């Protein structure tokens, strides 16, 4: 059941999701850069039925894991979660962590030190000079801080051995000033609104070539004792998207969620690894949208406005873009739009490969949604202008409902061509 003041939480989640997707690294060999308070509860009638029309339910195969959109860690809607297992490299000493956010708009695995057994000894990453490596993952309004460690990651039947991950820990060394100055700390599950992040976008590493030749402030650090200094870092040592490090099914992923009409208390779908590697991840007639090899973006044209920095981002709780067509809600819900009635809109998505795709979508009144569908975790009509510039169109989780959405990893071969691209 949703708290009546939950739109404060909604706002925070939207901010976080935008941040994760916008501030990742990426670019691989190409270079580039790449979310409560409560005042009681009320009993409400159930929202409209979830219609599983497209995609159809499937048996979960060895290369797939169940995805759930539910109330999660902080009762925030439109957050898709999976469970992952972290193991000390080469051992059976493992910990399974639930409610990990599936984020197609970022790259790399991030978990909390507090959720790992104290006895689990994950080796810390070192750079070529022997520095212990730490990372500041920047968001628009905050950051996560912690060491970079090596772990065996297991999800479904897939495994990535000795994968560099970020272990979020506010007590690791001392947070550098150029990291802390970014904004609020997101170093607990409550402030991150998830138990971690599974970043499975189109790039292999979270900073890519940007961080190789020179130190990038507020990113990677070499630490000695409690002192940490910005350092450059080879791509192979950076926090990594696990998919290209799987033995098979390693060229991308497909996120499949059911159609939702109005709202639903929870929904379940699948995250399938690989594109065209198994019978359950065929590309079929999906439209391949080429993205920039430097930052993973494409172009959206909506109502005559061109948004040159567009992304497909499962880690965002709504569709976020600036427009004069609809008014924003009154404070404190100004992160979202509040049209007088549900708006039926259309847009044209344009890939860097020349592919164009018409998309229809709807935007509801966020204040009305919070009242009508209180307690629901899947809300397909949420959209807003929150913290995006005029060039950004963030196609968040509402876009994913009722679709199979693919993300092809850079430099990996697929039936739709070599990544990076997205498809649906």
Where are these regions (language model features)?
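Aspartyl protease catalytic domain
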Residues: 40-77, 162-306, 417-422
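Bacterial signal peptide processing site
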Residues: 24-29
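Signature of the N-terminal lobe/flap region of pepsin-like aspartyl proteases
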Residues: 93-95, 102-176
């Amino acid at each position: 059941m949703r708290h009546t003041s939950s739109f404060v939480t909604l706002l925070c989640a939207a901010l976080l999701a935008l941040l994760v997707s916008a501030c990742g690294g990426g670019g691989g060999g190409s270079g580039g850069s790449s979310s409560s308070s409560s005042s009681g509860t009320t009993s409400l009638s159930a929202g409209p039925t979830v219609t599983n029309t497209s995609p159809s339910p499937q048996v979960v195969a060895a290369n797939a894991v169940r995805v759930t959109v539910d109330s999660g860690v902080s009762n925030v809607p439109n957050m898709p979660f999976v469970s992952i297992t972290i193991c000390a490299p080469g051992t059976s000493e493992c910990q399974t962590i639930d409610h990990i956010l599936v984020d197609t708009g970022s790259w790399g695995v991030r978990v909390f030190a507090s959720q790992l057994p104290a006895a689990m000894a994950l080796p810390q990453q070192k750079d070529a000079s022997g520095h212990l490596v730490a990372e500041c993952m920047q968001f628009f309004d905050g950051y996560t801080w912690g060491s970079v460690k090596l772990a065996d990651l297991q999800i479904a039947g897939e495994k990535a051995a000795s994968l560099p991950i970020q272990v979020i820990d506010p007590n690791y060394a001392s947070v550098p000033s150029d990291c802390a100055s970014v904004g609020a700390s997101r170093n607990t599950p409550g402030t991150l609104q998830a138990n971690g992040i599974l970043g499975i976008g189109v790039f292999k590493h979270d900073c890519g070539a940007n961080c190789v030749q020179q130190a990038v402030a507020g990113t990677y650090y070499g630490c000695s004792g409690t002192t940490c200094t910005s350092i450059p870092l080879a791509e192979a040592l950076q926090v990594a998207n696990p998919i290209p490090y799987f033995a098979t099914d390693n060229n991308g992923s497909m996120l499949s969620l059911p159609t939702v009409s109005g709202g639903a208390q929870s929904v379940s779908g699948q995250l399938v690894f690989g594109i065209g590697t198994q019978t359950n991840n065929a590309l079929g007639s999906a439209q391949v949208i080429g993205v920039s090899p430097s930052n993973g973006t494409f172009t959206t044209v909506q109502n005559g406005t061109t948004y040159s920095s567009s992304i497909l981002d499962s880690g965002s709780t709504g569709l976020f873009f600036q427009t004069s067509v609809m008014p924003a809600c009154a404070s404190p819900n100004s992160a979202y739009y509040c049209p007088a009635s549900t708006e039926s809109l259309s847009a044209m998505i344009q890939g860097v490969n020349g592919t164009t795709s018409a998309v229809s979508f709807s935007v509801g009144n966020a204040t009305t949604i919070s009242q009508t569908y209180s307690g629901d975790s899947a809300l397909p009509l949420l959209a807003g202008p929150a913290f995006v510039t005029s060039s950004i169109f963030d196609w968040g989780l509402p876009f994913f409902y009722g679709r199979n959405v693919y993300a092809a990893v850079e430099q990996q071969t697929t039936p739709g061509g070599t990544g990076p691209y997205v498809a649906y």
